[in-house]
Amino acid sequence: MLARFPLYLRLIRMDKPIGSLLLLWPTLNALWIASDGHPAPSLVVIFALGTLLMRSAGCAINDYADRDFDRHVKRTAERPLTSGKIRAWEAIAIAVGLALVSFLLILPLNGLTKELSVVAVFVAATYPFMKRFFAIPQAYLGIAFGFGIPMAFAAVQDTVPMIAWAMLAANVFWSVAYDTAYAMVDRDDDLKIGMRTSAITFGRHDVLAIMLCYAAMLGIYVWLGAALHFGWPYWAGWAAAAGCSIYHYTLIKDRERMACFAAFRHNNWLGGVLFAGIAAHYALAVR
């Protein structure tokens, strides 16, 4: 078992934290806004660990669902499950175990948060299979990656206000943007094996679609900042995030594979500076 441990870590992408960070930033945004900048440390720990665990569980489920497709894609052919180094039942067992630990984390929280967690698990577990049916499965991914937002509001306020759903919508647009750039890396392979992705659906309009999704996401955050009367630190963070999106355009405009992958990874900075703006607004407002 110990000899297989490194394979399990690769299965759940512990060597690639970018996915966890893309889940974490929107969740932290929600925690800070829901608590007026003063989230309980215990909640921050619970949601940070929950984000890591559920993203890891999602990776295991994704590799299980895609195991027959991944062997035909150069980038994924050597994943532990695809290459036969671990078995399918091991991936399922790991996913279930991680999901159970995640549920244990939220046991101290209120009933609404627990109810929403059931929806979150369902969406996360079914996302990998949506790539067979949906033309833009990245939108479904945005719901899965962003469900920590309504859960955070529920944990703090015991309700989910409209602003939480607006933030979830923003996350859907953001996910479509960054994951389309990611899908552009594998587009040729995905076309051969019949996988459905937004990069294939958007076709020659892929770059335009990505930039429109960034614009929609940033537009929602303009409304959010105005509605909550945020000060200049927030708008500085927003401007930095907008600058990141423009930089991403320079990377994806020629559709070069590695540049598209770099744009995907750089979204960590976009999410980070936006959260920094929110946190700085509340921190400076106290003084």
Swiss-Prot record:
Belongs to the UbiA prenyltransferase family. This is 4-hydroxybenzoate octaprenyltransferase. It comes from Burkholderia mallei (strain ATCC 23344). Pathway: Cofactor biosynthesis; ubiquinone biosynthesis. Keywords: Cell inner membrane, Cell membrane, Magnesium, Membrane, Transferase, Transmembrane, Transmembrane helix, Ubiquinone biosynthesis. Its EC number is 2.5.1.39. It is found in: Cell inner membrane. InterPro entries: HB_polyprenyltransferase-like (IPR006370), Prenyltransferase (IPR039653), UbiA_prenyltransferase (IPR000537), UbiA_prenylTrfase_CS (IPR030470), UbiA_sf (IPR044878). GO terms for cellular component: plasma membrane. GO terms for biological process: ubiquinone biosynthetic process.
